[in-house]
Amino acid sequence: MNPALFSNELEYLYTGQGFGEAFEFLYESFESRLSEPQPEGDAEELRIDKLRKDLVFMWRSRLYSDIRISLTGTFSSTPHEDTTAVFASHRFILVSRSPYFYNALVSWAKPKPQQANEPITLSLPSPPFTPASLHFTLGFLYTGTLIFSSTPYDLNTAFAILRSATYLSLDTLYDEIQARIIQEMMHGLFHTFLSFAEYERLTSSKWGTGGCRCRQCARRAPRVLEFAVAHDVRNPYLERGARRALISLFGEGWCTSEFAALPQKLRESLLKGVGKHMTVENVFPLLFAAEHALIKLNPVNDAWGDTVREMIESGRRALDEVLCNQAEACFMQLEWLEIMENDGARFEDGEKAEWIMEAILRGMNDKNCAILYQVRATTI
């Protein structure tokens, strides 16, 4: 075999460029050769897309497969029963795309096939790998992207993919799945890539702004936070964004079993984070959020409801103190002025005024009662 020719063939196999263009010309239809030439950028994208599809076909059809990867763990619906999942793959893809597989197949002692003429089998640990995460990880190795398939993956699988990327030293896969968790699954995760100073400047230090507070984010944020602080993950971006989200979700956003399931130390740190936002400017929005949460928790009889109720009431007590100790400044805020100007015309104004009066009664003490009396006479 001509070495130069073989080198060109390998270049095309790996990159989709070079040698193969001659064959593409020979096998293209006469009509396609007469068509208008496409811009270089589009042509490049088409070549890459074609290469991806060819490699995925080769992988899924097991064409020329020369290696197997096995996982053993409790994957089935039957608890405490180990099962084994086996994936067919190609040595040249694994070695060229992953430092871990390069070491396993080239540098370390070579595993031997169980029988003659059988491909060798590599075993991977579970955890961190699961059948779903390994499927997407292998797909990424073949295509360079996680969108090689229309099959979706859930948040747990995304977590497993990130752990798999760490295990295999795949920085590009790590970055992609991290970005997809943040942007697609958590709707931006409260601008997690911004520093504290940049985020405060963006939100003007107003609580509850700067990110998505939908029901999906409220249920997923506790899971993202617990995952991010795990000893084998320690992801600063996921942790920072999840903390921002949960602090901004104080109130009804905490009324989930997922939040109650967080370790107590994490829940206390989040309440402390809310406390840092208990400023004069934020006192009324936070107080209203706490009251709405307590109303939502009224029909909840499960144990998790008691856990959340205790957290909300603890936060509300701190808000009562801020309101009573800084009453003069608080009652100059827009939320109160709007209630007074509308003269109770809006249905919710009466309810909010009642919540504020109850907060004053709870927070009043010997030290602030004189100030509260003066404010009541001039403002309330």
Task: Report the location of each language-model feature.
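Alpha-helical oligomerization interface recognition
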Residues: 1-3, 62-119, 131, 138, ...
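N-terminal BTB/POZ boundary and linker segment
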Residues: 2-91, 95, 139-158, 163, ...
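Extended alpha-helical solenoid/arm regions of large eukaryotic scaffolding proteins
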Residues: 123-124, 136
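Structural signal for repeat-unit boundaries in curved repeat scaffolds
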Residues: 131-134, 158
